[in-house]
Amino acid sequence: MGVFSCLTIWYFYHIILIEGPHRRKFMSNFKAEFYATDDGSKPAKDFILSQDTKMKAKLLGLVDILEQYGNQLREPYSKPLDDGIFELRAKIGSDISRVMYFFYFEGRIILTNGFVKKAQKTPPSEIALAKKYRKDFLERNGRI
């Protein structure tokens, strides 16, 4: 097994499978978590896991970096889009993927959805979907 595969397994184990207060901590106060719909599905997690090995590792590494730097993370890794919605930006060769997120109280970062970028601009439908998920999250968590 190559070094790259070992790193992929490490990221998968530590970021995807281990969620909760027992997760390893960085010297930051930020913690990324996946938005869950009413039926328990997690669109951003499902998107990341559906990617090929290299893109999956890149996206999981970016989630790690996002937890370390939080709202200080800038381009080329993160970009603000609209009304408090941000995108994590991953590129490998000509393949470009994005994961949408927003900041919540007490350093929580909520990853909402992801997509493969095909056009120059981020599709408005993806931003609208992230806003819809944020609205649902806030309603169910009593902060709207």
Residue ranges and their predicted role:
Residues 1-96, 105-109, 118-144:
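Basic, Lys/Arg-enriched alpha-helical interface segments
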Residues 112:
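Conserved catalytic cores of phosphodiester-cleaving nucleases, focusing on short active-site segments
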Residues 115:
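Residue-level signal for short, function-critical loop segments
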